[in-house]
């Protein structure tokens, strides 16, 4: 009999979540504008593909960086050999400068307090390994990124206790919600070691208010616990209010750099979302605590960033003309694309939480549910995936307490494909429901009593050929 470890067989990876199941269905039948026009359109992937042309243009003008040359001389052998686990100094300096630039240079970062990791997934898990032991807990506000169930729990043995937030105040964190989560952990005999937040929020697509950040700092200071701020979407805040880093609020409070709260606030960053480079696997841990930095550096040996990647990105991020233009253009394009999605949803009678950041919208489909239950939410989600052929993420996969919310991504697909997705959704809503267009605000609707016919025919009809020639053909 084949014997595997408990970690290998324990069902805490989250692969049975509807979030991952939607991906599996997409991979079986992926949409292609020529070869599979009736396939599933991927709107469950938080990738930023809107500014690749800016990076490709820079690479074309700076061939030495990609060719591993410096002053005309090859440095391939130098990069191919073992490097210090601390990372290339030039890259760490470029990285902290870019982090500061995204935050409007309101805060600065010390490269000696930065630990490089193979993506934000590794960074978050490393933080949990550093701060908590198996059987202890972290508090996370809902709704939250479904992957946290895998990233934070699977190998660490740490528990997640949700901080339940609701639509009544736009899913903002409240003192009551924090205290209730802490008390719930105590009832379960779980020692709370920290709070982890994502700012800007995934899946809400909103930035945290200054008051929320002050509240969090007061809470962790009072409880004597840590605060991890996952800020991997910090460069995606495209509308006011602007993004505020937890480090900025620490500075505003004039915290003593030797105080416990100063030492217990940490940041996760990555280039996956802001630069659209998830395949490069570049993440970072930032902490004011020397012991955390030392421990994380040791653990980073299990997930290093290649020296070739560091060299290329060091050259790219050190070009201030590029970074200034990229940040501004990225904001502009994200705002335009988000507006397009919101407009398309409104034509189907569907509204969204008012968002100002991220690569997705938090979409309100409560009025389309058969009943106010998570069973009804899953029923609607299955129709959208299997009949409408759109992969979106149901709120239940994000641990939302209210049925009927969905995360819909907009930056990972061409504009033409987004148009097609909105046509499919509008046809679906018109077929199944009686819903007026939204002109701002939520809408109520009634289930259509007409015969519910298969949507296969109209899905087939909504191909690009029916909407005119493809530009450039």
Swiss-Prot record:
InterPro entries: Aminotransferase_I/II_large, Ethylene_sulfur-biosynth, NHTrfase_class1_PyrdxlP-BS, PyrdxlP-dep_Trfase, PyrdxlP-dep_Trfase_major, PyrdxlP-dep_Trfase_small
A GO molecular-function descriptor: 1-aminocyclopropane-1-carboxylate synthase activity
Residue sites binding substrate per the record: 84-85, 145, 151
Catalytic activity: S-adenosyl-L-methionine = 1-aminocyclopropane-1-carboxylate + S-methyl-5'-thioadenosine + H(+); (2S)-2-amino-3-butenoate + H2O = 2-oxobutanoate + NH4(+)
Family, per entry: Belongs to the class-I pyridoxal-phosphate-dependent aminotransferase family.
Quaternary structure and partners: Homodimer.
Protein name from the UniProt record: 1-aminocyclopropane-1-carboxylate synthase
């Amino acid at each position: 009999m084949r014997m595997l470890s408990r970690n290998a067989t324990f069902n805490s990876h989250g692969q049975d979540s509807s979030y991952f199941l939607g991906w599996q269905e997409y991979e079986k039948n992926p949409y292609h504008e020529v070869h599979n026009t009736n396939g599933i359109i991927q709107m469950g992937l938080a990738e930023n593909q809107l500014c690749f042309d800016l990076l490709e243009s820079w690479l074309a003008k700076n061939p030495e960086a990609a060719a591993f040359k410096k002053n005309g001389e090859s440095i391939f052998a130098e990069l191919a050999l073992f490097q210090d686990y601390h990372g290339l100094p030039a890259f760490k300096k470029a990285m902290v400068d870019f982090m500061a630039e995204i935050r409007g240079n309101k805060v600065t970062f010390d490269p000696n307090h930065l630990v490089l990791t193979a993506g934000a997934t590794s960074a978050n898990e490393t933080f949990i390994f550093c701060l908590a032991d198996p059987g202890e807990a972290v508090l996370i506000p809902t709704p939250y990124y479904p992957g946290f169930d895998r990233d934070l729990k699977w190998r660490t043995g740490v528990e997640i206790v949700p901080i339940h937030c609701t639509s009544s105040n736009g899913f903002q964190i409240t003192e009551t919600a924090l205290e209730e989560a802490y008390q719930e952990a105590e009832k379960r005999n779980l020692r709370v070691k920290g709070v982890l937040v994502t700012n800007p929020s995934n899946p809400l697509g909103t930035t945290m208010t200054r008051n929320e950040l002050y509240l969090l700092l007061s809470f962790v200071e009072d409880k004597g616990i840590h605060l991890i701020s996952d800020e991997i979407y910090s460069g995606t805040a495209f509308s006011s209010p602007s993004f505020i880093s937890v480090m900025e609020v620490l500075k505003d409070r004039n915290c003593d750099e030797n105080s416990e709260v100063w030492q217990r606030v940490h940041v996760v960053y990555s280039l996956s979302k802001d630069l659209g480079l998830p395949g490069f696997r570049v993440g970072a841990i930032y902490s004011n605590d020397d012991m955390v930095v030392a421990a994380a550096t040791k653990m980073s040996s299990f997930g290093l960033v290649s020296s070739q990647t560091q060299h290329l990105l060091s050259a790219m991020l050190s070009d201030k003309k590029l970074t200034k233009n990229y940040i501004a253009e990225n904001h502009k394009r994200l705002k335009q694309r988000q507006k397009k999605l919101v407009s398309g949803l409104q034509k189907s009678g569907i509204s969204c939480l008012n968002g100002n950041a991220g690569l997705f919208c938090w979409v309100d489909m409560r009025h389309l549910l058969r009943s106010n239950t998570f069973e009804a939410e899953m029923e609607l989600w299955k129709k959208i995936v299997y009949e409408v052929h759109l992969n979106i993420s149901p709120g239940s996969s994000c641990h939302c307490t209210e049925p009927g919310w969905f995360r819909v991504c907009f930056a990972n697909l061409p504009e033409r494909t987004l148009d097609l997705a909105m046509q499919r959704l509008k046809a679906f809503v018109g077929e199944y429901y009686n819903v007026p267009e939204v002109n701002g605000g939520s809408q109520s609707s009634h289930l259509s009593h007409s015969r519910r016919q298969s949507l296969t025919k109209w899905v087939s009809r909504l191909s690009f050929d029916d909407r005119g020639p493809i530009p450039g053909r």
